Amino acid sequence: MHNTLLEKIIAYLSLPGFHSLNNPPLSEAFNLYVHTAPLAATSLFIFTHKELELKPKSSPLRALKILTPFTILYISMIYCFLLTDTELTLSSKTFVLIVKKRSVFVFFLYNTIYWDIYIHIFVLLVPYRNI
């Protein structure tokens, strides 16, 4: 049995995430795309953190106290999207049934997940820049 180069790359990069048996190569490519969101958000934060400003009257302890629940929420959402395997084809939820029918809908799903993770990671990093 001969594996093509694409199959070898996909096998090497098989990351947990959303997968569809209807179009595995597209699904794997989008899954890889979604997994680049944390790197992109962290890079943006590193290059722009000096221009970001928080309210000067906030104490670091108060900021930690307020932001801890949000941090837990963001981390749990990121975990659900990046570190768990979900097969879209086998799901019986109506939304997923609609999404898995067309590649365009799958693209919008992955794109929404990407930007959700990107924004949440950036928002997660901003308050902690002075702490």
UniProtKB/Swiss-Prot annotation:
Q: Which GO terms describe its biological process?
A: bacteriocin immunity
Cystine pairs annotated here are none
| Location (main, coarse) | membrane
Q: Which UniProt keywords apply?
A: Bacteriocin immunity, Cell membrane, Membrane, Plasmid, Transmembrane, Transmembrane helix
TM segment ranges? 66-84, 104-124
Q: By what name is this protein known?
A: Colicin-N immunity protein
Which gene produces this protein? cni
Family annotation (InterPro entries) = Colicin_im (IPR005557)
What is the membrane topology noted in the UniProt record heading this document? Multi-pass membrane protein
GO CC, one annotated term:
plasma membrane
GO MF entries: toxic substance binding
Location comes to:
Cell membrane
